Amino acid sequence: MQTSEREGSGPELSPSVMPEAPLESPPFPTKSPAFDLFNLVLSYKRLEIYLEPLKDAGDGVRYLLRWQMPLCSLLTCLGLNVLFLTLNEGAWYSVGALMISVPALLGYLQEVCRARLPDSELMRRKYHSVRQEDLQRGRLSRPEAVAEVKSFLIQLEAFLSRLCCTCEAAYRVLHWENPVVSSQFYGALLGTVCMLYLLPLCWVLTLLNSTLFLGNVEFFRVVSEYRASLQQRMNPKQEEHAFESPPPPDVGGKDGLMDSTPALTPTEDLTPGSVEEAEEAEPDEEFKDAIEETHLVVLEDDEGAPCPAEDELALQDNGFLSKNEVLRSKVSRLTERLRKRYPTNNFGNCTGCSATFSVLKKRRSCSNCGNSFCSRCCSFKVPKSSMGATAPEAQRETVFVCASCNQTLSK
């Protein structure tokens, strides 16, 4: 009987339940609102406008802390220290009230005295959403909107990168990845707590202000510049004498004059080969060959000074010589000249610091005097034109010279 009742009740209940199911079922989910990137950019621009006074104040503080105007920064530092040490509690309350009332008065005057533009004038003067009225009532064109979106994404990416770097640095300090930095950080915190407990608040503020102004790198830069200028004013004669008189060469008779290699002719000023070839060729003979070959190429391109008269007459008398033989004679003559000019320092030591040349300590030849130096002592670059080269490429191409030759050529 029970089963029959259940079977009978099944079809009776189903008609009553089925019509109520659609009424009790939840409505179909509505489509989620689409994300509008341009509205996000407009909100960001409005936020920039609202925070513009704070940004200007931060720029002013950074301008003072970086000592862009040393006198103004010094007066600000001293004035704040005097205020921190002399003002009592009542004076501080007065300063707080003044700091509240002055911005309020300025904002009221700005709002009252500002001219309100109509919509037509605003649309005519519209430009890249700079003011708040432009953002609220003006409409941007498609190129302007795309430019705003791109600028926003670039700024957002830079901000997130800086934030990630800051968080990583904080985690490194907190996790003691660098014990020195972490110990300094926690030591500074403990020192600050002790200072707040032991010293009065006015002295704490004075120390903090002095640290911000006098403890940065820009302050030491300004001090070093003023010290250098003061020394130059106190002894200008010594400075001029140091610049005007180069170090005298070693005079040891005729041999000493030959070794000192005096001022070179324009033909000899066309310097030897490139630095790469000089560094790759370790033995002396390979180094000389690289100098000779590249020197010949530079001479042919630059059309240097003519050969001596005797050589020219000999070439004219031998009219049957071909171009290859003429070139061969020039090669032999310039090779002999370069070998005479090659420095006497063939023992593998740097002329400047006396370091021994090795696989790691490469030999480098000064393109002006020809002496052998290491890469550290011969690291000054000068254009070939300063050495007398007249080719158009000489204005762009540079060669390595030693310190003394660099001072001589740069005058």
From Swiss-Prot:
Question: What GO CC annotations are associated with the protein?
Answer: axon; cytosol; dendrite; endoplasmic reticulum; endoplasmic reticulum membrane; endoplasmic reticulum tubular network; growth cone membrane; intracellular membrane-bounded organelle
Q: Where does Zn(2+) 1 bind?
A: C350, C353, C374, C377
Region listing for Necessary for interaction with RAB11A and function in neurite outgrowth, in residue ranges = 51-64
Task: Locate the region Disordered.
Answer: 1-27, 234-286
Q: Name one Pfam family in it.
A: FYVE
Q: Which CDD domains match?
A: FYVE_protrudin
Q: How does this protein sit in the membrane?
A: Multi-pass membrane protein
Please give the positions of the paired cysteines in each disulfide bond. Answer: none
**Chief localization:** membrane
Q: Which GO terms describe its molecular function?
A: identical protein binding; zinc ion binding
Q: Which residues lie on this side of the membrane: Lumenal?
A: 88
Per the record, which residues fall in region Sufficient for localization to endoplasmic reticulum tubular network and for interactions with REEP1, REEP5, ATL1, ATL2, ATL3 and SPAST? 1-205
UniProt PTM: Phosphorylated. Phosphorylation is induced by NGF through the MAPK/ERK pathway and modulates interaction with RAB11A.
The alphabetized list of GO BP terms reads: endoplasmic reticulum tubular network formation; neuron projection development; neurotrophin TRK receptor signaling pathway; positive regulation of axon extension; protein localization to plasma membrane; vesicle-mediated transport
Q: Where are the zinc fingers (FYVE-type)?
A: 344-410
The chain's Cytoplasmic topological domains, given as residue ranges, are 1-66, 110-187, 209-411
The regions listed as transmembrane in this protein's record are 67-87, 89-109
Q: Where is the composition biased (Acidic residues)?
A: 276-286
**Necessary for interaction with KIF5A: annotated span:** 271-361
InterPro entries xrefs? Protrudin, Znf_FYVE, Znf_FYVE-rel, Znf_FYVE_PHD, Znf_RING/FYVE/PHD
Residues that bind Zn(2+) 2, according to the entry? Answer: C366, C369, C402, C405
Subunit-level organization? Can form homooligomers (monomers, dimers and tetramers). Interacts with RAB11A (GDP-bound form); regulates RAB11A. Interacts with FKBP8; may negatively regulate ZFYVE27 phosphorylation. Interacts with VAPA (via MSP domain); may regulate ZFYVE27 retention in the endoplasmic reticulum and its function in cell projections formation. Interacts with VAPB (via MSP domain). Interacts with REEP1, REEP5 and ATL1. Interacts with ATL2, ATL3 and SPAST. Interacts with KIF5A and RTN3. Interacts with RAB11B (GDP-bound form), SURF4, KIF5B and KIF5C.
Q: What does this protein do?
A: Key regulator of RAB11-dependent vesicular trafficking during neurite extension through polarized membrane transport. Promotes axonal elongation and contributes to the establishment of neuronal cell polarity. Involved in nerve growth factor-induced neurite formation in VAPA-dependent manner. Contributes to both the formation and stabilization of the tubular ER network. Involved in ER morphogenesis by regulating the sheet-to-tubule balance and possibly the density of tubule interconnections.
The entry's protein name is Protrudin
Q: What is the lineage of its organism?
A: Eukaryota, Metazoa, Chordata, Craniata, Vertebrata
Source gene? ZFYVE27
